[in-house]
């Protein structure tokens, strides 16, 4: 019986593990292609010199020592939230509630700084604020985990909705604590006394934040890869049935992991309020909870690689703002360039994991069958 159906021109085949230098070569090639595409679009749409545009992006992050430290601060905050969501992601618990957990930590820190400024010493107030932020973030992460463990609720929707609750809760307290009344904002908390503010190192208010997040990065890496708890959450992520078979209490792991994720987000909230911004607003989290999802996936849940992924995203965000200001471009155009670069970077992961296998020529196939 003749089979007249043709084999597809190509099909997708999963690769074996590529050597690290080949994988990074593909990523580097993707970045180069992305920059070329962005240059063509920039010249076509705006008429600007793409080299000047790229130079402006680089200068916005590396043009001075202060700019470098601002980049480091932005990188650290993104990295902190990425570290927070990663344990849950490894467990296949889709924690989209980083925004709300950060705001919970921010609210707790601000409450301590406002309500306890005149009653406790500065060092003790900082410690209380840190602990309160950790607890607040852990509670905010623990609520959806409890419902997931108890009634198998959808964690994606639950954690997402918790973001809106946290935002409105912060908005409520901003009105209560607003200075002056009717201003709709709190302003700088304890500006004259600086009670509850993290100390500066060498006159640099960003350095301590960066150090804390780097220490946290090492701790999370060790926790995920060399601890019993890290092993358990990986097993749960691979198969809940297998985890139960080997005696792992899945519900306990879910709650424990989300308490940890929320606590780390709470630390980020504390660093934002007590370390750098010294205020409270609904926009203080700055969308980091959602950006962290992309960073965590881009780094394949590896805390060390997240350092570079976070720096890339922070650099692109800062550069996009700079070129929209310096060249008078619509900020949406800057976001388009950022999106194109990210598209190529994320898309290249497909070619690292898979390859295209093309249909063999008819003559060659016949020769092989002889």
Where would I find each of the regions flagged by the language model?
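Cytosolic-side transmembrane-helix boundaries in multi-pass membrane proteins
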Residues: 1-31, 39, 44, 218, ...
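Helix-loop-helix "hairpin" substructures at the membrane interface of multi-pass membrane proteins
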Residues: 202-279, 303-304
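Transmembrane alpha-helical segments in multi-pass inner-membrane proteins
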Residues: 259-265, 271-339
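Single transmembrane alpha-helix segments in multi-pass membrane proteins
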Residues: 42-46, 56, 61-116, 130, ...
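Hydrophobic alpha-helical segments embedded in the membrane of multi-pass proteins
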Residues: 75-86, 107, 138-142, 164, ...
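Short loop segments and helix-boundary regions at transmembrane helix junctions
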Residues: 17-25, 89-97, 121-190, 226, ...
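Transmembrane helix-bundle core of multi-pass membrane transporters
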Residues: 155-226, 279, 333, 364-369
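Short, non-helical or kinked segments that cap or interrupt transmembrane helices
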Residues: 47-52, 89-106, 149-158, 232, ...
């Amino acid at each position: 019986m003749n089979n007249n159906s043709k084999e597809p021109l190509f099909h997708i085949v999963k690769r074996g593990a590529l050597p690290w230098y080949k994988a990074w070569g593909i990523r580097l090639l993707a970045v180069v292609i992305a920059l070329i595409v962005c240059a063509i679009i920039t010249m076509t749409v705006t008429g600007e010199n793409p080299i000047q545009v790229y130079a402006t992006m680089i200068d916005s992050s590396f043009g001075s020592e202060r700019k470098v430290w601002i980049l480091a601060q932005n990188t650290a905050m993104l990295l902190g939230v990425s570290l927070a969501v990663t344990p849950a992601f490894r467990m296949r618990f889709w924690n989209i509630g980083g925004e709300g957990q950060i705001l919970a930590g921010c609210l707790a820190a601000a409450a301590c700084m406002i309500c306890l400024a005149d009653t406790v010493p500065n060092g003790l107030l900082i410690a209380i604020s840190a602990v309160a932020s950790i607890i607040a973030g852990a509670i905010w992460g623990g609520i959806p985990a409890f419902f997931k463990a108890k009634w198998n609720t959808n964690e994606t929707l639950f954690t997402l909705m918790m973001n809106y609750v946290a935002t409105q809760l912060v908005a409520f307290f901003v009105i209560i604590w607003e200075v002056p009344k009717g201003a709709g904002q709190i302003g700088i908390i304890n500006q004259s006394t600086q009670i509850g503010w993290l100390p500066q190192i060498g006159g640099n208010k960003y350095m301590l934040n960066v150090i804390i997040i780097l220490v946290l990065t090492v701790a999370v890496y060790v926790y995920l890869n060399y601890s019993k708890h890290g092993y358990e959450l990986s097993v749960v992520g691979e198969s809940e049935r297998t985890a139960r078979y080997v005696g792992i209490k899945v519900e306990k792991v879910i709650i424990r992991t989300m308490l940890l994720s929320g606590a780390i987000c709470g630390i980020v909230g504390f660093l934002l309020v007590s370390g750098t911004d010294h205020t409270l607003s609904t926009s203080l989290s700055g969308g980091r909870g959602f950006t962290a999802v992309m960073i965590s996936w881009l780094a394949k849940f590896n805390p060390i690689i997240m350092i570079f992924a976070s720096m890339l995203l922070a650099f692109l965000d800062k550069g996009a703002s700079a070129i929209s200001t310096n060249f008078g471009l619509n900020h949406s155009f800057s976001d388009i360039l950022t999106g194109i670069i990210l598209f190529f970077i994320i898309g290249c992961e497909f070619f690292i994991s898979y390859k295209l296998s093309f249909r063999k020529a008819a003559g060659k196939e016949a020769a092989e069958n002889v």
